[in-house]
Amino acid sequence: MDSQLSENLLKCVNETYRGAMLVRNGLPIATAGDVNAEEQRVICEWNSNAVSEVLHLHDSNTKILIATKESCVLGLIYRNT
């Protein structure tokens, strides 16, 4: 596993998993669990060249671990309870 992705996974340890979303070309392919409109927007608009990144939503306890592979974006949503 990519070391950056491993480090970013560790940032989400002890957080409550809420849902996931798979996106291609800015359009959702699949959604699971609890994903709100703001989280969906962030994942769909993410276009970084980084392998992975943990995003903290403004004024929220939500973390989104985003990873890219083969032009797809996977967003895993966690909440600090």
Swiss-Prot record:
Domain of life of the organism encoding this protein: Eukaryota
Protein name according to UniProt: Uncharacterized protein C23D3.16
Biological process annotations from GO: regulation of TORC1 signaling
Single GO cellular component term: Ragulator complex
